[in-house]
Amino acid sequence: MGPAEAGRRGAASPVPPPLVRVAPSLFLGSARAAGAEEQLARAGVTLCVNVSRQQPGPRAPGVAELRVPVFDDPAEDLLAHLEPTCAAMEAAVRAGGACLVYCKNGRSRSAAVCTAYLMRHRGLSLAKAFQMVKSARPVAEPNPGFWSQLQKYEEALQAQSCLQGEPPALGLGPEA
């Protein structure tokens, strides 16, 4: 389903909840979720990944923020941020916390980062990782530029699996 169909479908269906559970310790949502202190506490969220340049950070005490400063624009370089962002998310999970990844609408940027995390730290293919994200949040639809970058990230992760302990060569620009 393309962005146009998703938009029409989203208009006909109720507004999605501010945050949804994608996997154990991984939540995806809109900017409203960062302000939902009770829900963040119930979910055990200790790290909010704010995938935006303009949305406010979390207001809940004890919740750290990692800002990934990108607009929802296919030309934005999200790929350069994926490896450090996924590493920070995994560190929060290993420390016993949970992560909320959000952007303005919880649709493109945050869905792309959740998909990348599932690929990097759960060993899923791009197709399987995105299926998990889409099942949890049906409005999820990374823009075409982010989807292309997720494909490059998957290729880098596949190449890395042959070289144990080597991080993928990322962040070298759009050609990476």
From Swiss-Prot:
Q: For this entry, list what GO says about its biological process.
A: dephosphorylation
Determine the domain of life of the protein's source.
Eukaryota
Among its keywords, does the record have Hydrolase?
A: yes
Instruction: Spell out the activity-pH relationship.
Output: Optimum pH is 6.0.
Q: Which SMART domains match?
A: DSPc
Tyrosine-protein phosphatase domain location is: 17-159
This protein's record includes keyword Transcription? no
Q: Which family does the UniProt entry place this protein in?
A: Belongs to the protein-tyrosine phosphatase family. Non-receptor class dual specificity subfamily.
Q: What does this protein do?
A: Has phosphatase activity with the synthetic substrate 6,8-difluoro-4-methylumbelliferyl phosphate (in vitro). Has almost no detectable activity with phosphotyrosine, even less activity with phosphothreonine and displays complete lack of activity with phosphoserine. The poor activity with phosphotyrosine may be due to steric hindrance by bulky amino acid sidechains that obstruct access to the active site.
What is the protein name for this chain?
Dual specificity phosphatase 28
Organism lineage string: Eukaryota, Metazoa, Chordata, Craniata, Vertebrata
